[in-house]
């Protein structure tokens, strides 16, 4: 069977010599599948590595600032062609060489890298104050959409997805080249593209085709199969039957097909592994370390999830009896409640759970109500340990504007089904009563926890402490009718601020001074430590992590004197950079994802 020729014309900006080598390699690979040659005789694995290396070198030479995107697209197209030719063969003629066995793993790695860089293009542009042209943004969105679709169906309809990805990528590159020739792209945008579009690491891509005996690339099928069995397996989502070895680097917005999962691409799951995918092992703070802090397992990410029910945590006497009655009669009296229309719609949306209190799913209590545990005095059940074990495998970061409840947990038969007391909200005085009587529209809007990067001292603090201090008004009494609320009486006069308490107030100059000091120490200590680690062989110097604003800030700080007078006006360059770091929390997280560093990783605060 002849090799397919439809994908050989979709490569981006290749020289005739590379195209000739590529055609010869695909032809020999098809002959290996037809058992005319052996993979070792024509060195398919080594030639595949060399052709991917040629893609990267060609993109670095002629791809300008977006050469990383061009190299990723060409490598993705190359492995898609190999997989298409393998699938077209019969089962007895395919899968007898190293490239055929490792092709799904390499395809998943390339797609993951393509999705990560396209996500970074949209996430980090606003935080770095980069304006994306409309034509480039539209073309990039189409590329990201096709990449996400292919990530779910990488083993199905390969020709259609491959052609769609390459067509969208070619359109993006053409728009970039045209606007660059016309002088419509600013230097900041081109530097941003060079920072975002990183090159794939071939050593990681071909790690499944390295012999454990010699340490070199091999075409021995037995060595490759034995190595693949030792790799950890991961799945895109719980309902997806396809599994992969490197899908653990995917963010949470790619782990489900529901639209709600992509509303907040900043809060990602498995970001510590995504750091390793982009820059190798780094010493930055991970989400796992921030999640398992001394303040509690889930306390760092929500103000409503406090702890598991136990005999040492009894509920309030009044609230317990009232909430138990509400939870038991919620299925029959949901239409007779005195709440507003929005709460009725929410009750109808939650009707499947409320009508079956003994279903296999975890029941979700209404807003403002404390769930009543069925057996509060019994010792901890085995299912609690099971929840801890499953949570260790995949961290869950709930959306700050959504109800903070974990998804239903898979359980074995024979365990208790009444799990209403799985998580208890934080007990606050009058919060449950006011929610029940006043309803959603009357209550004050819920305060959303501001996002802080992992490693920040504010990441594990409770919600009131992490929010900015705001003047708190008097507590209103519950209103049961439409009569206007009485005029609140003034409270006691505020106490005078003492000199000792004045130090606790926020000082912008002090915050700026601490930020400058932290950044200076990071530039003096963290970067030399990385260079020493690279010298010792723990990090490859040919793939340094992109730093973006960090390089510019370090250069600006080095040109200044040691004694920085904060009373005098700062330079415009330093003032803009400091404002970007201090006022934009998305940039802090974006820098942590891309570099593994954070200005709050030091112990100065």
UniProtKB/Swiss-Prot annotation:
InterPro entries: Herpes_TAF50. Residues 321-338 have a biased composition (Low complexity). The keyword DNA-binding applies. One of its GO terms (molecular function) is DNA binding. Residues 341-353 have a biased composition (Basic and acidic residues). Residues 307-380, 447-499 are annotated as: Disordered. Its main location: host cell. It is found in: Host nucleus; Virion tegument. GO terms for cellular component: host cell nucleus; viral tegument. Interacts with human ATF7IP protein, leading to promote and regulate host genes in virus-infected cells. Interacts with RNA polymerase III complex; this interaction downregulates small RNA transcription and 5'-pppRNA production. Belongs to the herpesviridae Rta family. This is Replication and transcription activator. It comes from Epstein-Barr virus (strain B95-8).
